């Protein structure tokens, strides 16, 4: 999860002019809730946490899943949005909805896990995934052609009173392992160098016995 990406989602999708940590945490809470929903509620295709590792991590060192959540819309916009299974599935493959700033169109997917909640039937999910497969912009590595793990939980997304997100009948959280996440590392490396050059926060580590 990349704070910069989540700030942008809050501004663009939710119309929050100056998002704070409360806004970011509320959005992240929806993601965590969706990932663990199948452990807590019934569904036709339940997925446990061990399956994430099995399906998303082809090699131990390639273990950096990219998170996407849809729909992220405010109550004002929800009136005009249909949010069908197909629409929220397609939204997960849009760079603007990802919680790390990178462009999957520049890389290839190794594995994808789609976790649906609410008013969702397996037939619609299969149709949405089949449509995604036909898109040329979404490419999978040659050695992992199937690439999709699906989860369906019947419990609808929980609406938080006075929260930022609108109440919706269905939602999807996507965890994917894509080579494009490599774009995030040089940016993170640069930010670290800037902070370390000013010795920001270094005193906390020195206080715990580490050398500067």
Swiss-Prot record:
Location of the protein in the cell: Cytoplasm, Cytoskeleton
Location of the active site: 51
E.C. designation(s): 3.6.5.-
Keywords: Cytoplasm, Cytoskeleton, GTP-binding, Hydrolase, Microtubule, Nucleotide-binding
Biological processes per GO annotation: microtubule-based process
Catalytic activity field: GTP + H2O = GDP + phosphate + H(+)
Cofactor(s) listed in the protein's UniProt record: Mg(2+)
Chain segments annotated as coiled-coil in the UniProt record: none
Superkingdom of origin: Eukaryota
GO cellular component, one term: cytoplasm
Record SMART domains: Tubulin_C
Residues reported to bind GTP: 3, 25
Gene Ontology molecular function, alphabetical: GTP binding; hydrolase activity; structural constituent of cytoskeleton
Function description: Tubulin is the major constituent of microtubules, a cylinder consisting of laterally associated linear protofilaments composed of alpha- and beta-tubulin heterodimers. Microtubules grow by the addition of GTP-tubulin dimers to the microtubule end, where a stabilizing cap forms. Below the cap, tubulin dimers are in GDP-bound state, owing to GTPase activity of alpha-tubulin.
Subunit structure and binding partners: Dimer of alpha and beta chains. A typical microtubule is a hollow water-filled tube with an outer diameter of 25 nm and an inner diameter of 15 nM. Alpha-beta heterodimers associate head-to-tail to form protofilaments running lengthwise along the microtubule wall with the beta-tubulin subunit facing the microtubule plus end conferring a structural polarity. Microtubules usually have 13 protofilaments but different protofilament numbers can be found in some organisms and specialized cells.
Stated family: Belongs to the tubulin family.
Protein name (record): Tubulin alpha chain
Organism the protein comes from: Pneumocystis carinii
């Amino acid at each position: 999860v990349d704070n910069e990406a989540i700030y942008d989602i809050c501004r663009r999708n939710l119309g929050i002019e100056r998002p704070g940590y409360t806004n970011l945490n509320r959005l992240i809470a929806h993601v965590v809730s969706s990932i663990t929903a199948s452990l807590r509620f019934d569904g036709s295709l339940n997925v446990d946490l061990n399956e994430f590792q099995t399906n998303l991590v082809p090699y131990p060192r390639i273990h950096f899943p990219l998170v996407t959540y849809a729909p992220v819309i405010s109550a004002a916009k929800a009136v005009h949005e249909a949010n069908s299974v197909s629409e929220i599935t397609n939204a997960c493959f849009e760079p603007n909805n990802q919680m790390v700033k990178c462009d999957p169109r520049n890389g290839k997917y190794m594995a994808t896990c789609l976790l649906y909640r609410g008013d969702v039937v397996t037939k619609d999910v299969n149709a949405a995934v089949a449509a995604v497969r036909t898109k040329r912009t979404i490419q999978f590595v040659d050695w992992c052609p199937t690439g999709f793990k699906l989860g369906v939980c019947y419990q609808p997304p929980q609406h938080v009173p006075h929260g930022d997100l609108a109440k919706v009948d269905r939602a999807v959280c996507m965890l994917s392992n894509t080579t494009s996440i490599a774009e995030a590392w040089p940016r993170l490396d640069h930010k670290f160098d800037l902070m370390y050059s000013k010795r920001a926060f270094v005193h906390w580590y020195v206080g715990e016995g580490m050398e500067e």
